[in-house]
Each structure stands twice: as structure tokens, then as C-alpha cells.
């Protein structure tokens, strides 16, 4: 419980006592969109199924988002009596930017009396950092690109002399990779005592 004296001190010293809520600096909502398409068909010799999808997600603060593409294809082919070939292809590609759980955690960890930005517009130094650097997309970015692909082929043969028995040959190839890119640029944060005094004009 704050006394009237404390409240007056907070109001009259905005560079010393904050009245902050980091959640106010975040966007009110994020969103995601999903698009998908699938096609299937065939005949008694060949059957196929192909699908693809795209997802876009926007986060709650500057520059945070994700784009993801995924695809799947399946082919079943009758070659000769008792011999079939199945081919499966799956994969996805993702592009994530500035994804971080610590920024949201910071929204709840800082005291509302902590000054985040001085009246001069400069960012306050909180042990050399400031959560608004991430919220406003300052200081650089982190981007993560992933690519996962799998191809699987199965050749199955039903033994004509042993009803219900079959043998198969299966091969699988995986191609997975990930690229992380980090870009940093220096940003200035200040403590209250280091804010330069406004220049005064000579009388």
C-alpha cells in the first residue's frame, strides 16, 4: 500500500520511479493463418495423394513471426501380379524470426516502478539491457530456418506359393538441415544520472 507521499513522489519523478506495465507495449493480439490443399485420385493400377499447407503466424511484438510450408505425397503403383511399389514423400520448411519466451516472461518479472524509458525518449539501462529492445525490434534479430525432407520407397512382393506371405524391400532417405542467423547492432541504454542535461542558450 502506497502512502500519499509515495504516490506524489512517483508522479513527480518519472525518471526515477516508473509507472510501467510491459504488457502495454505488446500488441493486443497475435494471429495465425492456415491454408491447405489436397488432391487424390488414380485407377486400379496407380493411386496417388498429394497435399500441401502454409501457415503464417505473427507474434505479440515487433518482428516476431513464423512461416511454415509442409507437403506430403503418396503413390501406390501395381507393377505386375503380386508386385507393388509404394512411394511416400513428406517434408516441411520453417522460417522463424525473433522467437523468444524471455520477452513475455519479462513482462511479468519487472516491477511496475522500474523505469523503462526516460522522458527524453531514451531507454533506461536495466543491468545493461532493457526488455523494450526486443519488444521494439532493436539491437538486431535472430532467424532460424529449418528444412526437413523424407523420401521412403517400399517394394512389396506377395509370394504366390505361400498364401498370405510377402517380402518387401524398403529404402528411406532423410535430408534435414537448419540454419541459424544472428545479427546484432549496438543500442544505447542509460541510467538516470547519465542523461545529458538539455543545452541552454546564452542570455
Segments from the language model and where they lie:
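Residues embedded in well-ordered regular secondary structure
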Residues: 1-62, 101-102
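Acidic/polar loop-and-plug regions of large Gram-negative outer-membrane beta-barrel proteins
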Residues: 7, 14-16, 97-150, 193-202
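Extracellular loop and loop/strand-boundary signature of outer-membrane beta-barrel proteins
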Residues: 22-24, 57-61, 74, 136-142, ...
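Outer-membrane beta-barrel transmembrane strands
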Residues: 28-44, 53, 69, 133-182
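Membrane-spanning beta-strand positions in outer-membrane beta-barrel proteins
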Residues: 47-51, 78, 84-88, 164-166
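Small-side-chain secondary-structure face that scaffolds active or pore-lining regions
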Residues: 60-68, 90-92, 98-103, 147-148, ...
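Short secondary-structure subsegments characteristic of cysteine-rich extracellular domains
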Residues: 66-78
